[in-house]
């Protein structure tokens, strides 16, 4: 038995290192990935430690060699790293050295990042989200829920995994019937796939080739005047104040960022949300009667069980994080999920508090210039699914089977399976 912040906690049996001996070197274990929050409580009480060895997006476990990093767990220190982007670089030399293609927008610094982000911001403006994105999502959710029907279902496999992939295929203008490829690409790229090492590497290469083909075809369609008005087309035709446009390689980079980040994290956001329904059935009934509660419910879920758990940064000069000196060239790993559970920022952080006054200060989608550009879309995906379920079913009950959380990669927190029983209204 271990005591953390006055609370008793029994570590999972398969945890290799337990109790006070637990350190940053031990964090990337399946038992911790499944439920990291008690271990975050422990790590926030310790000095910043060296030795986190994880896999950034796009790297392949068993092929690439992790670079040890300083683990940053306290809210103020996580935010400090994000805010000081000139010191803590997003350029990912581990991913760049990987045999898998290096294409993530989050792995780029100024000034390239600013130009790329400004192009993307046009696509995700609140006006466009309201006019185009929200109706698309409602339509997709209606179709999926109508097809699935009431009764027992694995929410993750049948609904959560498909919604973001279907939406991204529509957003980018790739063939609608290939949305399952989008999901497969995202799983492999973000490290949560059940594929073998060789299969993950092959899928990452196929991922790159898939969008190389579709981007090249879109350029041809634009030249011929036959291209549809969608996000990929917008990436190609957008230009900055000096008339500069994205290269085909940068357009591909955007598409892969959308798939790898949007498809994977949104899946776990949806899954964590449905788990909250199962944990708090009384809130489900309240939201059926008052849909204005959806947003605060969603925001507290994003803080308390937000999917994105950690990201890496490289230090560009000697600096300090708190009382710890970080040398130029060393890596740091910021744990968003730990910051969201820091009691110095969020009172009683493990509790679900619907009207939490500072919930908007959560770090799930990052902070500063690297705040996720698609966060508004992710929120709309979650809201669309919630509204669709609330419209059709008077209750969401535990289904046949066990809720099992994924334990393959620390990038995202969330369930692999959630059996539910949809009770028709």
Specify the residue positions occupied by each region the protein language model found.
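Cytochrome P450
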Residues: 1-425
């Amino acid at each position: 038995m271990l005591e953390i912040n006055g609370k008793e906690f029994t570590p999972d049996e398969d945890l290799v290192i337990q109790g006070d001996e637990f350190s940053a070197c031990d964090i990337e274990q399946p038992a911790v990935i499944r439920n990291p929050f008690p271990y975050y409580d422990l790590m926030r009480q310790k000095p910043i430690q060296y030795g986190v060895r994880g896999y950034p997006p796009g790297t392949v476990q068993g092929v690439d060699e992790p670079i040890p990093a300083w683990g940053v767990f306290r809210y103020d220190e996580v935010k400090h790293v994000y805010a000081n982007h000139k010191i803590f670089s997003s350029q990912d030399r581990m991913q760049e050295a990987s045999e898998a293609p290096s294409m993530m927008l989050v792995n780029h610094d100024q000034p390239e990042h600013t130009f790329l982000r400004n192009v993307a911001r046009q696509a995700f403006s609140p006006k466009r989200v309201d006019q185009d994105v929200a109706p698309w999502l409602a339509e997709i959710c209606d179709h999926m829920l109508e097809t699935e029907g009431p009764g027992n279902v694995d929410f993750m496999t049948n609904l959560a995994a498909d919604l973001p992939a279907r939406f991204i295929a529509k957003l980018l203008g790739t063939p609608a019937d290939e949305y399952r490829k989008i999901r497969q690409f995202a799983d492999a790229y973000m490290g949560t796939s059940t594929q073998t090492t060789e299969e993950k590497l092959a899928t990452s290469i196929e991922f790159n080739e898939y969008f190389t083909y579709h981007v090249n075809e879109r350029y041809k369609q634009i030249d011929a005047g036959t291209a549809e008005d969608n996000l990929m087309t917008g990436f190609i035709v957008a230009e900055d104040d000096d008339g500069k446009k994205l290269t085909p390689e940068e357009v591909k980079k955007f598409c892969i960022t959308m798939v790898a980040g949007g498809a994977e994290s949104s899946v776990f956001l949806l899954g964590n949300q449905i788990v909250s329904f199962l944990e708090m059935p009384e809130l489900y009934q309240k939201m059926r009667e008052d849909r204005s509660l959806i947003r605060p419910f969603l925001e507290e879920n994003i803080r308390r069980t937000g999917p994105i758990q950690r990201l890496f940064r490289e230090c560009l000069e000697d600096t300090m994080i708190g009382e710890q000196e970080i040398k130029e060239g060393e890596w740091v790993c910021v744990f968003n999920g730990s910051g969201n559970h820091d009691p110095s920022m969020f009172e009683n952080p493990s509790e679900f508090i619907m009207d939490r006054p500072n919930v908007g200060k959560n770090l799930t989608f990052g902070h500063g210039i690297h705040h996720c550009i698609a966060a508004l879309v992710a929120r709309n995906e979650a809201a669309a699914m919630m509204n669709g379920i609330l419209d059709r079913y008077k209750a969401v009950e535990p289904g046949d089977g066990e809720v099992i959380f994924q334990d393959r990669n620390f990038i995202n927190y969330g369930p692999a399976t959630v059996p539910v029983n949809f009770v028709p209204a």
